[in-house]
Amino acid sequence: MFSSKIRSGAECAPKVLTLPLSVCLLLCVLCAMTLGQASPSNPPGSSVELYGGIELSNEGVKVIALQVSQTDDEPSIKGIYSEMIRLRLGRANDGEFPPQASTDAAQAVSTALSRLQQQYKVPPERIYFIGASGLGADHPKDLESVIRDATGLTLNFLDAVTEVQLSVAGTIPRTWKVAGVSTDNRNTSALIHFGNASTQAGYEMLKYSSFDSPAFDFVAMSIPQGVISYANEVSRAVGAGSTLFSFTRQVKTSSASSFRQALRKELESKPNLMHRKRVFLTGNLAWAVATLLYPQYRQTLVPITYDDIMQFSERIARDPKELALRNLTFIRDRKLRKEVEQDFEAIRATFKPQELIAGAEMLKVTAEELKWQNKEIFFARLGQLGCILSYTRLKIVK
């Protein structure tokens, strides 16, 4: 990817999903959970069950393990393990899938499955396996059969609307404190996910009716253009063997015009997307931007600003190495510095310089079109797990 020694690693129609309040309340508790690595524990007076979830997307394999303690009152859910195994499962610059794509995916899923069963003792019947909608729309022909032969698991793809709904519930905190007062955060926030092959967004609205019980509307947007697919589009436009300078000039000249137009068309039917007070960013691009800008910030929600996004777009276009290969000795804590260095290495293995440049332009265009100048913007570090977390949680409480 970068020249350093590293390890390799049609627009949708407007859609609104209306859910009964009872179903949505099950989703509302998700963000109170903390995912990480921990040993299962058995609280006094309770029985414990273990569940696992695996999600396959163009960006990789996301895996979680949950411990459910059945008490007299209600189930208590605790995250005991989470991991992101990054892969490149999308089409390459020539429009074809890498020949080893299905094999790599099956190996990663097999690794996740083994870890859930052997290390965390999750029974096979309590492990749920889903595929992201973008991968479902465009994937290698043999992907499902190769995974099934290697793991015994059947891949069930989500549709885009359901995926966005689950991601919103699993990523955006239910409440938010403003001047010491708790407010309904999901009714004033939006989720934006920049994927490799698509860009998704969504938000929640509580609607009241004099004829029926309250219901939530999950408004979803999905544009079939992501960081890698846009970079491939630019590469084809400038021609094979073109220089990084030519690529960057094309990105800046076109300013992601096709993506901008698709976004504007979506906003015609979803104008409220511009009026959310807070924005939560997820996906590999958001992770790379937040890490390269603020490597020392390791909290769950990393704040970034509109100006950060504008400046990142210019800096990464001017010299990708300036950010991706920066000196990290200013981080005094050695353990933290090592963790950050591993993240930087992972970023360089995940993205080519051209892809970071293209992705930064897409992020800039989104910030401009959605008018983020006065918004609160956050990179949601655990947002990549939001969908599979919500999906597994709903299976548990059924």
Please give the residue ranges for each predicted region.
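Glycine-rich beta-strand-to-loop/alpha-helix junction loops that act as flexible
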Residues: 129-135, 194-199, 279-286
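Bacterial N-terminal signal peptides
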Residues: 20-32
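Bacterial Sec-dependent signal peptides at the C-terminal "C-region" and cleavage site
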Residues: 31-42
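Conserved phosphate-binding loops in N-terminal lobes of ATP-dependent enzymes
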Residues: 47-154
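Gly/Thr-rich phosphate-binding beta-strand-loop-beta motif of the actin/hexokinase/Hsp70
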Residues: 44-75, 178-212, 284
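N-terminal secretory signal peptides that target proteins for export/translocation
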Residues: 1-16
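Helical "lid/coupling" subdomains associated with nucleotide-phosphate turnover
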Residues: 92-110, 114, 120, 137-139, ...
